[in-house]
Amino acid sequence: MSSPEPSPVQPAGRARCQGAWQDAARARTEWTWRAGRLWQIVACLSRPENVTRSLVDSVARSPRGAYLPRMGEPSVPAVGTVERWAWDYVRCEHLEGKLRPAPLPEDWEPEIAPVRRLLAPGRPPELRVVAKAVKTRGLAAPSGRARALHTFFHHELQAAELMAWALLAFPGAPREFRRGLARIAQDEVRHMHLYAGHIARLGFSIGQFPVRDWFWERVPRCVDAASFVATMGLGVESANLEHSASFAARFREAGDEEGARIQEQIGSEEIGHVRFAVTWFQALRSNLDFESWRLALPAPLSPALMRGKPLQREARLRAGQSEAFLDELEAWQPDSPGS
């Protein structure tokens, strides 16, 4: 026996059904958008080491334009793009690849690209990563100077990787900003060569001393591009203006003029990196004052870790930091030890 034919839905009824379906779809979209945003915030603020690799935050755009999470690895960028160059550099596990990355491509992915927040870099087997670094003591012996330079080499490596990381993590940032990150990454690689060359002249090689991924333990907590430049350019690289001047004097005192010259050269080039951060923090947040910068640092970082002594005021002023900013930075005291 044949089933009775269903009665056709009248146009008015069809319209009501479609309207109800559309309302339900909008509600689902709104719910997933909010859930995705909450997930992003939690993932960004969590300690990276506590986020399992199965929850690597690859994301996709919702119809509303928000980024929503997908389980599994982030999507791999297309070959021949700047994004793929950055991806390959961060994930590279060969020392030669870290020291000599491929030439930077000219092509970019389309404007709407997924967020790719890589949780950790590839590490060459030569580098022995430890949980706690050994502090550099005296520089009189070549081994002491080589150890210090090895630490600085690894700082530059992490800086290069994190510039590439930010290029992938913040695809919604202006193209010119992301292009600048790639250029700075190339500068950091050049600095690595300066350090590696002098380490070799002292009779040592990359990998003879342990390293710590201190920057990687902290910087990926940055929630947006402004937070990133606050941490790296206005924080870490600004502090290096003091550290490079201090170590240049110490190397010269130890009779190592070449080591002192390298410190001075890198310190001078850091001014441009800090200026880049000043420019973009102002562009992204409309204003750069001490308090807005301090609040942009991801916990537990604070201004105490982003300055050396004595403050290199002239270099910082050349980089675009104001007298008022420097006065507050110099005077700032943490609420508790270790902040």
Q: Model-found features: residue ranges?
A:
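Leucine-biased recognition of intrinsically disordered, low-complexity hydrophobic segments
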Residues: 38, 45, 55-56, 68
